[in-house]
A protein has these predicted regions:
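Positively charged n-region of N-terminal signal peptides that target proteins for export
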Residues: 1-4, 18-20
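Sec-dependent N-terminal signal peptides
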Residues: 6-10
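C-terminal motif of bacterial Sec signal peptides marking the signal peptidase cleavage site
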Residues: 13-16
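Compositionally biased intrinsically disordered regions enriched in Thr/Gly
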Residues: 18-266
Length: 266
């Protein structure tokens, strides 16, 4: 299993050797050690040869050492990491591998329960009943005391294309809670932050204003908003808009970094 050790307060030698803008992965004091835990399954819809099948691959990160490891893991399990969100209903009792195995069993049972009757009546479209679910987590820290936890998901459930999206959580190491914008920004931040979001989108898509953004298919007929899917950084917030959230599918996932908000931080 791949191990990543997170600490909070960067080592001076790392700062000297690291390149500008390098992501911090090893820091010192108040340590939490994470391991990747992998779970896979392949489920055939029926016992017939060549029957449709569901393939699931989960590669998630969980804390294995550290004073707050259990609390961090409990937070992660109840944070909607994977869709369907079966993990939130599982009482892991500290056994993360057992929780993932339980997820796979429930996924397999629901796949057969929901798809088998449909397949029995629709043998001509066998490929439509194939499912793929891949979830891969990564952790980092871009801001002292905060673990950024991202899950990249690919889900195919019939049709032409699968869906890809990224989920980002910012976990305060000392409390194990997931931080929201309200937790880190001063009251009344909304108007100024919205303006900064529009400004960043205009820079990204070479637009002069919100109207031109809309003409380019971004935030068209949508009231601009900061995504609740974001990465906290030193002096900046990177917002993630999933595929088709604020623009057409061909633009894919959209990420913008909002800076110049020093007066908004708590």
């Amino acid at each position: 299993m791949k191990k990543i050790i997170l600490y909070f307060a960067i080592v001076a030698t790392m700062m000297a050797c690291g390149s500008k803008g390098e992501e911090k992965t090893i820091m010192e004091a108040e340590g939490l050690e994470f391991d990747s835990i992998v779970a896979d399954t392949l489920v055939r819809l029926t016992s017939e040869k060549g029957a449709p099948e569901a393939k699931v691959h989960l590669s998630l990160m969980f804390a294995t050492k550290g004073d707050n490891a259990k609390a961090v893991n409990d937070t992660l399990l109840h944070s909607g990491l994977v869709v369907p969100d079966y993990l939130s209903d599982i009482d892991a009792k500290g056994n993360i591998k057992a929780a993932l195995d339980t997820f796979l069993i429930r996924f397999a049972n629901d796949y057969k329960k929901n798809y088998a009757p449909l397949y029995q009546r629709d043998r001509e479209h066998k490929a439509s009943y194939n499912i793929v679910l891949n979830c891969k987590a990564k952790i980092n820290s871009y801001k002292d005391g905060i673990i950024n936890y991202q899950v990249e998901t690919y889900n195919y459930a019939g049709g032409k294309d699968g869906l890809r999206w990224t989920l980002s959580h910012n976990i305060e190491a000392k409390t194990a809670r997931i931080l929201t914008l309200d937790d880190v920004l001063v009251p009344g931040y909304e108007k100024q932050l919205k303006e900064k979001v529009v400004e960043a989108l205009c820079d990204k898509f070479d637009a002069d204003d919100l109207k031109e953004l809309g003409e380019k298919g971004v935030m068209y007929d949508i009231e601009p908003y900061p995504s609740n899917n974001f990465i906290l950084k030193d002096g900046a917030i990177e917002f993630i808009y999933v595929d088709s959230e604020i623009a057409a599918h061909d633009k894919g996932e959209i990420r913008i970094e909002v800076k110049g908000i020093d007066d908004l931080w708590k």
